[in-house]
């Protein structure tokens, strides 16, 4: 059986798995689970369709009631399954101690994958290479114009916002 390294608890029910993990290992554990699932299930695919894995990951404050954390994880898993395109995705839900929840979703077959993008962003934040306010400005852009603008225009506006920030050009384009 698969058990993530450092998991405080791991339970299975039907085809659902629940693991409690330290924040610094959760994304890598989710990626490792997806890779292992893909390898193990590859022989069982039909007509070029492999079985899918949808993962909901909840990041909560340590004082958050466990039931609330579990509810958030279930909502994240549901969005991973039901977002477009459906299934085979990771949804990370973040609930700060105060403020609104944030959700981000990406499919396992995206390039670069969501896990890599989030880990890279965290590295850049820790190194002070990306201003922390940049994420809030990009979130505001998506909320205000996300549906109204075509993808290319949205990316161009995001690059314009990042272009105003004091950061190396390579990080802006990443």
Give the predicted meaning of each segment.
Residues 1-174:
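Charged, helix-rich terminal subdomains or tails
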């Amino acid at each position: 059986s698969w058990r993530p390294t450092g998991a405080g608890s791991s339970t299975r029910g039907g085809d659902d798995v629940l693991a409690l993990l330290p924040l610094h290992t959760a994304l890598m554990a989710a990626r490792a689970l997806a890779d292992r699932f893909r390898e193990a299930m590859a022989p069982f695919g039909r007509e070029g369709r492999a079985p899918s894995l949808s993962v909901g990951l909840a990041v909560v404050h340590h004082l958050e009631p466990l039931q609330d954390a579990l509810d958030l994880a279930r909502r994240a898993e549901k969005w991973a399954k039901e977002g477009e395109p459906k299934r085979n995705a990771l949804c990370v839900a973040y609930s700060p101690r105060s403020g609104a929840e944030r959700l981000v979703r990406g499919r396992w077959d995206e390039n670069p994958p969501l896990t890599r993008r989030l880990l890279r962003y965290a590295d850049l934040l820790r190194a002070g290479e990306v201003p922390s306010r940049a994420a809030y400005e990009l979130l505001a852009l998506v909320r205000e114009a996300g549906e109204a603008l075509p993808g290319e225009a949205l990316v161009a506006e995001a690059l314009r916002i990042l272009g105003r920030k004091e950061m190396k050009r390579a990080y802006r384009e990443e």
